[in-house]
């Protein structure tokens, strides 16, 4: 991977700002997308026990945290060329025995959600920047529990 550019970081930041514009709505888009592709994922998130509820503060907090961590990963990539995930994240994901296909489902849901959030500002360049940031974030989590 080449260096993560200032423009790529700015693109990721702009998608984060769009997401923050309506966290409850975009949290629903995100988790609905996950459950459509992987219904069993419902068992991985305690706050999905009763379905996707936009008024559930745990649902919106988790989505906000994840999307924020992807944004932070873009900043780490720009500053350091690598992402270092928190060991606690590695531990949690290790306990749930997550595999690559599950990380892919989350990535696809994240992209779908942010595409909706940014609307006509969506570009291939934005998609690539988000994919790089997410992939490096996921790799950091996996490394933390390897």
UniProtKB/Swiss-Prot annotation:
Gene3D superfamilies: Globins. The modification Nitrated tyrosine is found at residues 26, 31, 134. Root nodules. Keywords: Cytoplasm, Heme, Iron, Metal-binding, Nitration, Nitrogen fixation, Nodulation, Nucleus, Oxygen transport, Phosphoprotein, Transport. It is found in: Cytoplasm, Cytosol; Nucleus. GO terms for biological process: nodulation. Nitrated mainly at Tyr-31 and, to a lower extent, at Tyr-26 and Tyr-134, in effective nodules and particularly in hypoxic conditions; this mechanism may play a protective role in the symbiosis by buffering toxic peroxynitrite NO(2)(-). Nitration level decrease during nodule senescence. Phosphorylation at Ser-46 disrupts the molecular environment of its porphyrin ring oxygen binding pocket, thus leading to a reduced oxygen consumption and to the delivery of oxygen O(2) to symbiosomes. The modification Phosphoserine is found at residue 46. O2 binds at residue 62. Heme b binds at residues 46, 93, 96. Belongs to the plant globin family. Monomer. This is Leghemoglobin.
């Amino acid at each position: 991977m080449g260096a993560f550019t200032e423009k790529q970081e700015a693109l990721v930041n702009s998608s984060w700002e769009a997401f923050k514009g309506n966290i409850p709505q975009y949290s629903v888009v995100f988790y609905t997308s996950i459950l459509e592709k992987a219904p069993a994922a419902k068992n991985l998130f305690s706050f999905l026990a009763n379905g996707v509820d936009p008024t559930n503060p745990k649902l919106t907090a988790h989505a906000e945290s994840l999307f924020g961590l992807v944004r932070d990963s873009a900043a780490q990539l720009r500053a350091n060329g690598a992402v270092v995930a928190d060991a606690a994240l590695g531990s949690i994901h290790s306990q749930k025995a997550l595999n690559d296909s599950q990380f892919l489902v989350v990535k696809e849901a994240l992209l779908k959600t942010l595409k909706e959030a940014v609307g006509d500002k969506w570009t291939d360049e934005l998609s690539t920047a988000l994919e790089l940031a997410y992939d490096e974030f996921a790799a950091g989590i996996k490394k933390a529990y390897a």
